[in-house]
Amino acid sequence: MASSMSLFISSSSNQTVNSDTLRLKQSSKPTNLIHPNPIKLVRSRQVIAGSIQCSTTPNSFGLDTTSPSPFYPLPPTCPKEIHPEQSAKPSRPSWNLFQRAAAAVLEAVEDNLIQNLLESGHPLPKTADPAVQIAGNFAPVGEQKPHHDLPVDGRIPPLINGVYLRNGANPLFEPVAGHHFFDGDGMVHAVHLRNGRASYACRFTETERLKQERAVGRAIFPKAIGELHGHSGIARLLLFYARGLLGLIDHSRGTGVANAGLIYFNNRLLAMSEDDLPYHVRIKPNGDLETAGRYDFDGQLTTTMIAHPKLDPETREFFALSYDVIKKPYLKYFRFSPCGEKSPDVEIPLPQPTMMHDFAITKNFVIIPDQQVVFKLQEMICGGSPVVYDKEKIARFGVLPKYAIDASEMQWIDVPDCFCFHLWNSWEEPETEEVVVIGSCMTPPDSIFNESEENLQSVLTEIRLNLRTGKSTRRPILRPGNSQINLEAGMVNRNRLGRRTRFAYLAIAEPWPKVSGFAKVDLASGEIQRFEYGDGGYGGEPYFVPREGCDREDGGYVLAFVHDEREGSSELLIMNAADMRLEAAVRLPSRVPYGFYGTFVSATELHSQA
């Protein structure tokens, strides 16, 4: 989930270290970080009085990692397979003598001027300290080729046929300076489910940034959040541009990490971060993953795209935003037809560059938040962070017809002191001329990016935008009898996105930034049902998979990766979304780090991949 601070970036030794005990090393030769933990024990569970009781049992993996039979039939027109082990091998850059000399000089500048003078003696804030940001199960792992016929506790529902995928940050190289969790290289974890059987694989998304850094053998692209603050951030930017001018790197091919969102659209699985174009990732018949390349929608997309596009469940249209932190227009809105034809951009006039991580759609509108976390690059000159909480700014939400050709039809409605990093759903209520927005209001708004002594709170909130009066109201959704809990990552039934929904499935983000379980929230009554992962168990986004042919809104299953920090083992849990009952736990052959967002690709969609 790289911040779009990376947007203004684009206008050694490979010794393995123990990633779970990572500590910052000021070295000009960073090490390769990836190193999976061996699994010794796995957990078994039973549901007792609505909570999950955990015990440990010996691991008994007898996995066939070389099964010759494909996990789904090979389509007649399937492209020639790429062997990831071969494509992942580093290829040294073909520099001439002058470039090699220039590279050595710039490396000396980085070591002696930036690291030893500008950065030495300045303690890193927790939000940029690698020892904090990528410690424990936030640390990276190595790639895994497909492991088939995984052990399963319980029974995988036979109606689940397809692949669950989840994206996350997984830095290949040890940071040379500051590092935020959002800065890591993208890695996709995939669990194939078919006829009660499961397989697992994980691969880096082969971004242009990753390929160039692998060729050089070290991290050379600036870390958007971890490094780009203060005078050292300016120096690292200048160093980056110097390397580009000398042909040592090519930022025109993209600087993004593709570590945040995943969506399946127009027969393609897309991995996204808001600092670049999306990347097309292909799911292979044997359960493996391969990166097809940077995807520009056949030349139609020339700008970055945020990592939370929206897919209308009725029209199958794709809606997205793109924002810029340097030049106007700071924000653009566009859409794609179901077959991938792009609309003209709609320029949204904003007075200053604003963080735009998420937005919402209804049947007829797009809902665009313009909130109080903004970009002020000049703050770096004064030694600060360019990501700023502007307390003087009044947050507002824009309501724009989906098919508007310009921003003249935009209606802005103030929603003071509101910062929603994510919006879970939105719908129209014509009887009151209101648009309802469901989101998690976060305080302090910039706490993810800047160190704060105030504890983070993420309050599930209903915001009402009255289109007739131009006023807004908001209220916390949980009933007063329920103690406040942080509800942050999750979703509603995607088949009802943009329409009135009753339920949301959201991660219990406690103790922050870990996730100790998830909640099924009744958005009307405020009642919640909790599924807790037990002592030492933590996960991430709960992903709702609707049951095919079922009309019930909660008819389906919730999938979530869960890691046991006591034993070092990871599982995929499958819960019944209606009664919150655990159906199955798939034991995974390697540790799955905490990550970001997922998607589910059905067996039918697997056959139709481009």
From Swiss-Prot:
It catalyses: a 9-cis-epoxycarotenoid + O2 = a 12'-apo-carotenal + 2-cis,4-trans-xanthoxin; 9-cis-violaxanthin + O2 = (3S,5R,6S)-5,6-epoxy-3-hydroxy-5,6-dihydro-12'-apo-beta-caroten-12'-al + 2-cis,4-trans-xanthoxin; 9'-cis-neoxanthin + O2 = (3S,5R,6R)-3,5-dihydroxy-6,7-didehydro-5,6-dihydro-12'-apo-beta-caroten-12'-al + 2-cis,4-trans-xanthoxin. It comes from the Eukaryota. Its main location: plastid. Its cofactor is Fe(2+). Residues 1-53 form a transit peptide. Keywords: Abscisic acid biosynthesis, Chloroplast, Dioxygenase, Iron, Metal-binding, Oxidoreductase, Plastid, Stress response, Transit peptide. One of its GO terms (biological process) is abscisic acid biosynthetic process. Has a 11,12(11',12') 9-cis epoxycarotenoid cleavage activity. Catalyzes the first step of abscisic-acid biosynthesis from carotenoids. Not active on the all-trans isomers of violaxanthin and neoxanthin. Contributes probably to abscisic acid synthesis for the induction of seed dormancy. This is 9-cis-epoxycarotenoid dioxygenase, chloroplastic. It comes from Oncidium hybrid cultivar. The gene is NCED.
